[in-house]
């Protein structure tokens, strides 16, 4: 496949830079207004792809993402509503979880891609999951759960891990490697990341 541009439709430039690092290729920022439905992460990603795909040309591809963070103590809440839930702050989240007693948590990243194949748009979704537990935060944060999330088998929070180690084990790293392998197999990128 002769490739055109690869776009990432997101409002979060940090996510854009992380995906660029994983895919080791140029990715342009697609600035479009998207509505976000309620539901499972994969359905949200599929809906985002439906909104972004009409903006690409036949040689282009577009990537979208969704992240969920589920607390076992809260029956899987906040899940895909993590961005809104974080507005109460990581300190308050810790206090709630500590009262209930179950500190288990799961982070999931779902990455979707839309591209043309034989004149038709093809859409695929790849997910990565990271299990861990919640700990008391060193500081209160209202934008990232990495300050309170310790991946299983590690001693420190995800946010403080060395970048190489975090990328190797993180939910976004797992999803990105699957996406990269797919993109390489379709000739969308020549090589893929770690």
UniProtKB/Swiss-Prot annotation:
Native organism taxonomy: Eukaryota, Fungi, Fungi incertae sedis, Microsporidia, Unikaryonidae
Residues where ITP binds: 10-15, 48, 66-67, 83, 166, 171-172
SUPFAM superfamilies to which the protein is assigned, alphabetical: ITPase-like
Keyword Lipoprotein: no
Cross-referenced CDD domains: HAM1
Protein name stated in the entry: Inosine triphosphate pyrophosphatase
Role description: Pyrophosphatase that hydrolyzes non-canonical purine nucleotides such as inosine triphosphate (ITP), deoxyinosine triphosphate (dITP) or xanthosine 5'-triphosphate (XTP) to their respective monophosphate derivatives. The enzyme does not distinguish between the deoxy- and ribose forms. Probably excludes non-canonical purines from RNA and DNA precursor pools, thus preventing their incorporation into RNA and DNA and avoiding chromosomal lesions.
Reactions this protein catalyses: ITP + H2O = IMP + diphosphate + H(+); dITP + H2O = dIMP + diphosphate + H(+); XTP + H2O = XMP + diphosphate + H(+)
Co-factor: note: Binds 1 divalent metal cation per subunit; can use either Mg(2+) or Mn(2+).
Keyword field: Cytoplasm, Hydrolase, Magnesium, Manganese, Metal-binding, Nucleotide metabolism, Nucleotide-binding, Nucleus
Binding, Mg(2+): 36
